[in-house]
A protein has these predicted regions:
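Flexible, compositionally biased loop and terminal segments
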Residues: 1-234
Length: 234
């Protein structure tokens, strides 16, 4: 049981490069990435981590990926959602699943499946909470929060001059701040992942492409977190 690392976020980068590196179809690489996400859920459960936030699809993907690639991703997401619905391990371990982001951009059938998953695995005490970022952008999250806040100020539900950070966080998709954020694929940036919540998160950048990550790599990241002296601005 891991006693200090409670909340983990992952940016699983490198699926397409994995396809190029191994001379396989992009679909096979994405499928390997989805399977790796299932392993990550098990690793977190085995380590006593309470929350895993996983950025599955960025908002930028909708404008920068081809229609064919997006269709492929949606197909694989649907298949993955069905695997989660059928997973006895998720039920036995009382996993909670939540999707966040601009879900209205997704195909209706896929959105319905995500809603079924959320209904199957509602919030509960004791198990792992899995947050899946779909059509997510940190800038969009802040903009969405600001728009909702402005509406509440306009209707006098909120007083602007007495607004606190805690009250603002109610307008975000997620309030919890990750203790540790892992990004794979050897890119040393967050690319807009939870900009408000990661202010004091420890950051671990792995050169491994996401499908290549092993439990030993995961444990290396946890050990890195254990070695840090968190200051929280002090």
């Amino acid at each position: 049981m891991h006693k200090t690392l409670s909340s983990l976020a992952i940016i699983p980068d490198g699926n397409r490069r994995y396809a190029q590196k191994n001379n396989i179809a992009v679909e096979q690489a994405y499928l390997a990435g989805f399977r790796k996400s299932e392993e990550a859920v098990r690793w977190c459960g085995d380590s006593g981590i309470k929350t895993l936030t996983y950025w599955a699809l960025s908002l930028d993907n909708f404008s920068k990926r081809s229609t064919d690639e997006l269709s492929l991703l949606f197909k694989l997401m649907k298949s993955h959602a069905q695997r989660v619905l059928d997973s006895q391990a998720y039920k036995d371990n009382e996993v909670t699943v939540r999707f966040f982001g601009k879900r209205e951009l997704l195909p209706a059938e896929l959105n319905r499946m995500f809603s079924k998953v959320e209904e199957m695995y509602p919030e509960r005490n004791g198990g792992l909470s899995l947050n899946m970022g779909i059509a997510y952008s940190g800038r969009d999250e802040l903009l969405n929060a600001a728009q909702k806040l402005a509406a509440d100020i306009s209707s006098q539900k909120v007083r602007a001059n007495s607004l606190t950070e805690s009250e603002f966080e109610k307008y975000l998709y997620l309030r919890e701040s990750p203790d540790l954020l892992i990004r794979t694929g050897d890119s040393h940036r967050l690319s807009g992942m939870m900009p408000w919540q990661t202010v004091y998160s420890e950051l671990f950048f792995s050169p491994k492409l996401w499908p290549e990550v092993t439990k030993a790599d995961f444990e290396e990241a946890v050990a890195f977190y254990d070695s840090t002296d968190r200051k929280f601005g002090k």
